[in-house]
Amino acid sequence: MNANPKFISANAHVDEAAVAPLPNSRKVYVTGSQPDIRVPMREITQADTPTGFGGEKNPPIYVYDTSGPYTDPDAKIDIRAGLPALRQRWIEARGDTESLQGLSSEYGRERAADPATAELRFPGLHRTPRRAQPGKNVSQMHYAKQGIITPEMEYIAIRENQRRAEYLESLKASGPNGAKLAAMMGRQHPGQAFGATAFGPNGLQEITPEFVREEVARGRAIIPANINHPESEPMIIGRNFLVKINANIGNSAVTSSIGEEVDKMTWAIRWGGDTVMDLSTGKHIHETREWIIRNSPVPIGTVPIYQALEKVNGKAEDLTWEIFRDTLIEQAEQGVDYFTIHAGVRLQYVPLTANRMTGIVSRGGSIMAKWCLAHHKESFLYEHFEDICEIMKAYDVSFSLGDGLRPGSIYDANDEAQLGELKTLGELTQIAWKHDVQVMIEGPGHVPMQLIKENMDLQLEWCDEAPFYTLGPLTTDIAPGYDHITSGIGAAMIGWFGTAMLCYVTPKEHLGLPNKDDVKTGIITYKLAAHAADLAKGHPGAQVRDNALSKARFEFRWEDQFNLGLDPDKAREFHDETLPKDSAKVAHFCSMCGPHFCSMKITQDVRDYAAKEGMSDADALKKGMEVKAVEFIKSGAEIYQRQ
């Protein structure tokens, strides 16, 4: 049973491990053009450079922060009350929505009236759902096409810039060498962006609210922001912005409780999950999702067909448009920000999977394929796509058009079924855009490295640059237990080529349901892949953190090395396995090479010698080699000598 009977809403509490601030970090807020636009960032404090290395100040580094109020010591966290509705005033001020009398989905009303769910229900929601007024469209894409810069767009522009300009100014003011230091720390290798317009020599130096608006209006980016999820902090998914990552959570029929899923969500966002998908497939899906949404500062995605299938006791052939429609409305009124909908699985494509090694591996894809075959007709998702668009624009739910025919092995990569579905997704994108509904496209899957760029290029062409959202791809099939690595390789590559969001893979992929440790491992692996892609594309400011960590490493500022990394806890743990004493945190060596063979220590010795003798580093190195050559000859010119 997936909702553990021991979970009682009255006893629910936050996971303490997810609340503590990260080491040497504090939450800061950057205010926009109005007081309630307060954009969170994580400020990482650095130690001064030791006197022997120049004794300069190292100002704080600012990094993108997805953890919401959870890592803010000033915030009062009560998961029974949920997070503050920070976007509520913006939504109401637009004057194009209305509060409903109550839930309008039949299933939602049934759950609310069912005494069996009373102890599981989220107790802290004291507002009714909102919906667009008749004839209105409340999507961020609709506003963007009208030329309107929303507070969400301004928020995103501030967030994407990560206070880079302020950091460089603080370097300039840090001392006599400030200008030189700013030039060094702001230096970045030119990227290869494969046509992404924001990058390159003539690209943007900072993201502006107007640029955000233009990209959303064009369909190259989406802002997943359901009007019934006002707790969410606005973010953007598009190839001209930082590469984002998604974390999957969710219960199953055999494991996990509501409390555990909320804990997984708070844990995932602590380590950098930009969005979270609730893929619950067991009982009490409705209640689990409510708890997650009300406590999530990041967009929440779902696959509505999973819950619809539960409503017909797991029999795909019994699914109907009416049941699915009610499920969409139920979830939209809870606040789901994006729906994965497998509308591209058409009857004509199903036979194309017959010769595959691994057939149809997508759960949603297999459900719809089975329905198509049972009824020998087109999927109701495809036939009712415009009806779905009407629902999406009434709540501002974004499409994540599902790749139900994605390859489940590298053997099946880039086959006719996969690419046929991709073309259909491109056609559906144009229909959604007619309704000003935001769209991203889901992608594979299992793809060897040499075929990855073809996937990206075809998606850009056929889907008119709508954001691509890929699961990996996994580049080989030989490593169960290590698929976070097999997929991380492909994720870094496809992120570089243009994918806007990467869906994480944990070590448990293909093996079991991930626990909290697996979630963290998947998140860190994919943050690494996304950052590598940002560097390769030449995203403005992407290299600042790398430069800061490299400088800390060269100056033996161990604590700063740990704290500037993606996982300070793991870095500190590995260091302390061999050098646990506090004195080792200031030592000019590590356990790899020891005190006499540290390359960075030797380099610093050369620089000290050069300064003492009044010569350049190169001259000092040459002089030192000459001195050592004389010593070698005087000692007998033997490579191995007795001590």
Curated annotation (Swiss-Prot):
Binding site for substrate: 248, 277, 306, 342, 362-364, 403-406, 442, 469
Cofactor or coenzyme needed: [4Fe-4S] cluster
Sites where the protein binds Zn(2+): 446, 510
Listed EC numbers: 4.1.99.17
Chemical reaction(s) catalysed: 5-amino-1-(5-phospho-beta-D-ribosyl)imidazole + S-adenosyl-L-methionine = 4-amino-2-methyl-5-(phosphooxymethyl)pyrimidine + CO + 5'-deoxyadenosine + formate + L-methionine + 3 H(+)
Binding-site positions, [4Fe-4S] cluster: 590, 593, 598
Pathway as given in its UniProt record: Cofactor biosynthesis; thiamine diphosphate biosynthesis
Similarity remark: Belongs to the ThiC family.
Its job: Catalyzes the synthesis of the hydroxymethylpyrimidine phosphate (HMP-P) moiety of thiamine from aminoimidazole ribotide (AIR) in a radical S-adenosyl-L-methionine (SAM)-dependent reaction.
Protein's recorded name: Phosphomethylpyrimidine synthase
Species for this entry: Paraburkholderia phymatum (strain DSM 17167 / CIP 108236 / LMG 21445 / STM815) (Burkholderia phymatum)
Lineage, opening ranks: Bacteria, Pseudomonadati, Pseudomonadota, Betaproteobacteria, Burkholderiales
Record gene name: thiC
